[in-house]
């Protein structure tokens, strides 16, 4: 089917020890720059090039100079839409760190943080649960799901370092290019600008 929309959550709670480093309460030290920037990479990989973003931030809970919560609306060049919310003041199991199982420093919740919806079904990520109708597609028909049972590596960070070494040695081509990284930075910059102006910002 055709991808229509996505919903991404990065909800986690950072305790007071996290803020002993004073730069984390200053502009640039919040969940936008520390957490959301990684979700941008993955959203672009899953949904394609971004056309525009519009965002809003809040420091409702901690009242620091930096945001503690943000929401972003993405419009993709494909026409698909996606919403993303990030907060480091919410006690919850829905963030890439707590669902992917890539880093042993984080307890795994066996939940998902990404939900991608299309005209023939939807998928949760990273637990890869696929939802669909059998036969006629309708909200009046039963929903079914199946687990895709793809074995994911628990050594992802090590694999990334090994891949980087192979690229440096000329043994492999980068899976993520410099252009990909630059595009993510452009999107991040647009999100910051939008949070200040309240306007929708186009990505060039």
Q: PLM ranges: what are they?
A:
Residues 125-126, 163-204:
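C-terminal helix-rich "cap/oligomerization" subdomain common to oxidoreductases
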Residues 63-67, 77-159:
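NAD(P)-dinucleotide binding in Rossmann-like oxidoreductases
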Residues 70-72, 112-114, 174, 192:
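Residue-level detector of beta-strand structural context in well-folded domains
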Residues 7, 54-56, 85, 117, ...:
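Residue-level detector of conserved, well-ordered beta-strand and adjacent loop positions
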Residues 29-31, 148-152, 170-174:
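Active-site rim elements
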Residues 34, 156-159, 176:
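Residue-level signal for the nucleotide or nucleotide-sugar donor/cofactor binding architecture
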Residues 38-42, 112, 160-163:
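Hydrophobic alpha-helical segments typical of transmembrane helices
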Residues 1-65, 70-74, 198:
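Predominantly a Rossmann-like dinucleotide-binding segment in NAD(P)-dependent oxidoreductases
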């Amino acid at each position: 089917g055709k991808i229509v929309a996505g919903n991404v959550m990065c909800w986690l709670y950072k305790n007071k020890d996290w803020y002993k480093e004073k730069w984390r309460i200053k502009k640039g030290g919040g969940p936008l720059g520390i957490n959301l920037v990684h979700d941008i990479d993955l959203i672009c990989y899953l949904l394609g090039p971004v056309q525009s973003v519009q965002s809003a931030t809040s420091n409702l809970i901690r009242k620091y100079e930096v945001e503690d919560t943000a929401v972003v609306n993405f419009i993709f060049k494909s026409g698909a839409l996606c919403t993303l919310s990030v907060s480091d003041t919410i006690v919850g199991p829905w963030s890439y760190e707590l669902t992917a199982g890539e880093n042993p420093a984080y307890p795994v919740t066996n939940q998902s943080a990404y939900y991608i919806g299309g005209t023939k079904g939807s998928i949760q990520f990273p637990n890869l649960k696929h939802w669909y109708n059998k036969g006629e597609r309708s909200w009046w028909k039963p929903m079914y799901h199946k687990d895709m049972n793809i074995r994911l590596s628990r050594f992802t960070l090590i694999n990334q370092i090994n891949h980087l070494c192979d690229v440096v040695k000329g043994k492999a081509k980068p899976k993520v290019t410099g252009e990909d990284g630059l595009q993510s930075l452009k999107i991040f910059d647009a999100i910051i600008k939008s949070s200040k102006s309240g306007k929708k910002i186009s990505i060039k």
